[in-house]
């Protein structure tokens, strides 16, 4: 309900916020905070397309341009190539993507049933209990990791000295986030994990430190 009073493109863009933008902003150093753009990058992407496009198609546009490209395809490619496996994505054939983009809304979502035309096309080919079973995510036990086996690493990598030397984040805000998460007051596990990954990335590719 945090974004319930947002209008138009602001509301559509808010559905794709992995983390609360205000929380992200609070974690940044004063120098980086001052350089933040005044407009949400997702809203900027929506400004590139026509206003009369239906909200569902706007959401699919953001899904394809940002979430799919930067998240799903990215980690699928990295993980598969790390194992020496070539993963193909036939549903991203350019002709099929263009055809799907032109389809009327009623073929994409029928009442609360998403991927409607795709599911109808598979009837008679796959069992209906496979086609229409509820979607299941592939989440990881992030909170258990952060509060368990990664707890010591988090304290070492995101120490006050480390944060101050990097000058990207506010060490007081980061320390408070970690403390509140460990105390069970909030679930800050994904924020902490992203901070951890950023610092490790910086050590490897900027500092050229062999970890």
Q: What spans do the regions from the language model cover?
A:
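Adenosyl-5′-phosphate
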Residues: 2-211
């Amino acid at each position: 309900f945090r974004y319930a009073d947002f209008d138009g493109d602001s509301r559509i863009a808010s559905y794709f916020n992995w983390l609360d933008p205000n929380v992200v902003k609070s974690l940044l150093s004063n120098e980086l905070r001052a350089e933040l753009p005044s407009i949400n990058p997702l809203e900027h992407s929506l400004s590139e397309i026509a206003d009369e496009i239906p909200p569902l198609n706007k959401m699919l546009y953001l899904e394809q341009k940002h979430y799919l490209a930067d998240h799903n395809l990215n980690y699928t490619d990295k993980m598969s190539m790390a194992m020496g496996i070539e993963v193909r994505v036939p549903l991203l054939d350019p002709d099929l993507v263009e055809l799907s983009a032109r389809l009327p809304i009623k073929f994409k979502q029928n009442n609360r049933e998403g991927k409607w035309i795709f599911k109808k096309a598979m009837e008679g080919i796959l069992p209906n209990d496979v086609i229409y079973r509820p979607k299941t995510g592939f989440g990881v036990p992030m909170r258990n990791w952060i509060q368990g086996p990664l707890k010591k690493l988090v304290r070492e990598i995101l120490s006050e000295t480390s944060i101050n030397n990097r000058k990207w984040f506010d060490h007081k805000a980061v320390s408070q986030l970690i403390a509140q998460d460990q105390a069970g007051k909030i679930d800050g596990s994904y924020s902490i994990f992203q901070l951890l990954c950023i610092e490790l990335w910086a050590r490897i590719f900027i500092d050229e430190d062999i970890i």
